[in-house]
Amino acid sequence: ITPCALPRTLFVLICPPSDKVMKFWNQPTPEEWTQNVIKELKNYTDRPVEIRLKPKRNERIADGNIIHALQNDVHCVVTYNSIAATEALLNGKPAIALGPNAATVLCNTSLSQVENPTTFDKLTMEAYAAHLTYCQFTKQEMQDGTAWRILNESS
């Protein structure tokens, strides 16, 4: 987990969702979504924008993965509901999530927040990572009631 530090010269990294995701959530195509986001961002920032399309599965384990992209001069990540939001947060970059996902509890949810995105200390991010880890269950744990018991204990 990397602490967050935001120099001024950074760009906004847009990680568009897949077509499959957008169809499921009854949203515009990824291309339309991206153009809409870029247009709205111009109302709030003059930062440069870079677009990172989701790589194919075999490319995600190579040097072109999101963690590599986050090592560049990223001010914040904007996505719909990609795991990129979680990866950004865990790598010290704030994220704006415009749709539901596991990171929404920590993400900003409006493009108007792009210049002052919420950042978190290491302790908060460690707690978030632990929470995500603790919410992972095996098929057996779901079938035998372990998952349900743990979820009820923590609510």
Task: Pin down the residues of each PLM region.
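Leloir-type glycosyltransferase catalytic cores
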Residues: 1-9, 106-155
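Short, low-complexity, polar/charged sequence segments that are solvent-exposed and flexible
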Residues: 31-36, 97-99, 115-116
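Conserved catalytic-core segment of nucleotide-activated headgroup transferases in glycan assembly
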Residues: 7-58
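Glycine-rich loops and low-complexity Gly/Arg-rich segments
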Residues: 37-40, 102-105, 120-122
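Donor nucleotide-activated moiety binding/catalytic core segment of transferases
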Residues: 42, 47-95, 100-102
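Short loop/turn segments at secondary-structure transitions that flank enzyme active sites
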Residues: 18-20, 101-104
